[in-house]
Design a protein with these regions (language model features):
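Hydrophobic transmembrane alpha-helices and their immediate loop junctions
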Residues: 1-234
Length: 234
């Protein structure tokens, strides 16, 4: 698959923002719920440098793009540190962890609303949405860059924000020990089951590398389709 360098830069930019939003939200929520650990480490910021992970923000996205030719790069930041005993309520850590993927889902909703506003208020925005969608989904098309309206880069960034935030929301909710889904499951399972889950984490990771992409696509595809239909019909 041929790669458009400008599109890749847009995707990586949106991915880094989505990861920073996820980590900053978890850090802020943990602090509000009683655990200042992440705040004291400067993690309640959208500054990507505070959440940087070489593997999650550089190696994994580049592998996804250039080796596996994924539709979108995906990644993660440094794990947000939380100290369970600092939470005054038993479900404090659970809610703090859940806030990350929920923030990404809400970001996708906000991007959709922004696109709808631009669609109905800015000249040529509506006519450009088909091109935006085709480029974002890597559909081969011929585009006359000189004929595109000035608002086009904003439209593309917003549409990619929908895609990226939905993708990372689904990805983060996978039941793997190093992701939010795994951290949430540990809180739900009985003690012995949670210990067994952590003990066999290596096998879960192996399973992810084998079928993780398929599992993500099962949820991500229909979610993106719903947002795309809403964008076209409203």
């Amino acid at each position: 698959m041929s790669q458009n360098p400008v599109l890749i830069l847009f995707e990586l930019f949106v991915m880094v923002l989505a990861i920073s939003l996820h980590d900053a939200t978890q850090s802020w929520a943990a602090n509000r719920l009683g655990d200042p650990t992440a705040r004291m480490l400067g993690r309640t910021t959208m500054n990507p440098a505070k959440h940087f992970s070489l593997w999650g923000m550089v190696i994994s996205p580049l592998l996804a793009i250039f080796i596996f030719s994924n539709l979108l790069p995906y990644g993660w930041g440094q794990p947000v540190p939380m100290t369970y005993r600092n939470f005054p309520k038993k479900n404090g850590e659970f809610l703090a962890v859940l806030s990350g993927p929920m923030a990404q889902f809400l970001a996708a909703v906000v991007a959709l609303i922004a696109l709808l506003i631009l669609k109905h208020t800015v000249a040529n925005a509506n006519a450009s949405l088909d091109i935006v969608e085709a480029l974002a989904l890597r559909v081969p098309i011929r585009v006359d860059l000189a004929a595109l309206p000035g608002i086009f880069p904003v439209l593309l960034l917003l549409y990619l924000s929908i895609m990226m935030n939905l993708l990372l929301c689904v990805f983060n909710m996978l039941p793997l020990p190093f992701l939010d889904g795994g951290r949430l499951i540990v809180h739900i399972l009985p003690y012995n089951a949670a210990k067994a889950f952590e003990q066999y984490s290596l096998y879960f990771m192996l399973g992810f590398f084998l079928i993780g992409g398929y599992v993500v696509s099962i949820v991500f595809g229909p979610l993106l389709a719903i947002f795309t239909v809403l964008l076209s019909k409203l």
